[in-house]
Amino acid sequence: DEADMTSLKDDLKNYVDTLENDIKGRKLFYIKEVCDKELYKDSNDEVLMKVLDDFYKTLDKLREEGFIIEEISIDKNLLEAIYPSYMSISCAEATSNNANLTGIQFGPRPEGVDSYQELMMKARTEGFSELIKRRFILGSFILQKENQEKLFLNACRVRRLIVDKINDLFKTYDGMILPASGGIAPKFSDDSEKLSDRYLIL
């Protein structure tokens, strides 16, 4: 669609055919501060220990196939800044990019409203999940004039430091390998609704 800046015209490629079979000597790295079992020795999380055991077994198999795998260290402060930076930027962008979700052009159209302000409020109240509402509230807070420098712009600066560090590592290594998750999906009964656990970490 020539009128849609998000569409892309590209010939279909078979990316599997472009893979090189010769993997010997390819260099991968993993991050000590994420994978070192010693860091979790005081934890009673058996699932996490099993994940890490399986991860190190996978590394051994990859080494047998010819990969060179090295452990590298990254400043813990930088690693701990990844999630709050992501939340700050993504919530701010979600709030800004979805400002057009008013219930006027598209979306749920509530009945019995007397003004477009009431229409927007009802459409967003009824049409958004609790998670989306939380993200929009955080995004609005982050984008307030008095918070932009402290929260949003600082998060962008931290993102730049993270990207620069990873790009620098990729000058030496062909790829990064890490466990996909520190555990398994929680049961509904185990899920915590404490917002401070996930959101109020800025």
Identify the residue ranges that each predicted region occupies.
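A short helix-breaking turn/cap at a secondary-structure junction
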Residues: D1-L52, Q117-K122
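Flexible, acidic loop-helix segments that line cofactor/substrate-binding pockets
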Residues: D4-L12, R26, K32, I72-M87, ...
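Glycine-rich, small-residue loops and helix-cap segments
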Residues: C35, V51-K61, E65-S73, E80-Y83, ...
